[in-house]
Amino acid sequence: MKFAGIIAEYDPFHNGHAWQLAQAKALGAQHVAVAMSCGLTQRGALPLLPEAVRVQAALQCGADLIFALPAPCACAGAEAFARAGVRILAAAGCDALVFGAETPDAALLMEAARVLNSEAYRTELKRQLAAGARSFAAARQAAVEALCPGTALAALLDKPNNNLAVEYCKAILEQEAPMTPVPLPRVGAGHGQALAESGHAQFASASALRALWAEQGADALTPYVPEKALELYKKAEIDGMYTDYAAAGRCELALLRAACARPEAFAAVRGVSEGLDHRLENAVRSCTGLPQLLDALTTVRYPRARMRRLAMDAALGYTADTVPALPPYLHLLGARREALPMLKNTALPVSHSLAKLEKENADCARMAAAQAAASDFGALCRRVPGPMGGVYRQKIIFLTN
């Protein structure tokens, strides 16, 4: 492993992320590239802090190159999120993918990925869903258990980071990416775990840190984030460069209400099927807040996380026709200067300028437009709102040792 890749959100960057970067280099990586969520996150919401703050924190704590994981790819389920991240890092030339997992066994994770990529699994999954499985996740586990009874594979899928790890392995197999999976054990708090539950004074999950910021401000993150990152967070707080989630919810619902004026308003939105467009429109017309809207949409069949992403897609007008399925370019957000030679032979167009990238081809233009929509939305929803077009004016962040 010489050129490792990491897929991350850094929302916000914390001690666990710094530990992961250090581990990648301890295992032999000379450089580490990161595909980082840009504009939106996998939970279907805006990141707490803008890209410039998160990129600088990661560079100061060990990352060498940071690429944007475009907003439509970041605001996606685990499978699409993983495919996009692997596509970016493979195109950049990474020879290994480093990620966290509750079960850090590369062979077992790859075995699970091969099962999930098989035709036998797809057939069994359909059978489980038709038989009335209580959820897609339950159907998936049941399908794997039916195909591989008595193994640890089905139980593997019961943990959130294992699930994402298997999706990373699936993407490596599907894309025939020359990358070795390198799973690391989770340290400290688990995915979505509250501070009180973590049992560790130094590590906390990103969701717990966002909640802590909302309650007590950036200073309260002191035990859980690197000192260099904390300095950036305190400045962002003073400058109002963080997301006002109450304002974001109102703005998102306003966009959804405006869309209702159009016939078949949500029929073409990504992920819409089985009448979900009508369900969404009815909820938008009757609900007065985003939490209420999500409550109305969420069922056992339609998990809240999926509905959260669907609502954001609908608000920003993301459709299958307007948004490419995979990133068509490498948008470089930040770099250590000594790592730039690693980009001499990329498999996709690479630039720090989105204006330049959007001129490469039609897919690049569509992805750039989708990115701009998310970035402009995010700028409006900060504690101190910003103007449109920031994603085109944003300069690359260089760090020189």
PLM regions: where:
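Short hydrophobic/aromatic-rich motifs at helix boundaries and adjacent loops
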Residues: 26-29, 56-60, 138-141, 180
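Non-catalytic positions within long, well-ordered alpha-helices that form the structural scaffold/packing
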Residues: 25, 59, 86-90
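Short, contiguous strand/loop micro-motifs
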Residues: 7-8, 41-42, 58, 72-73, ...
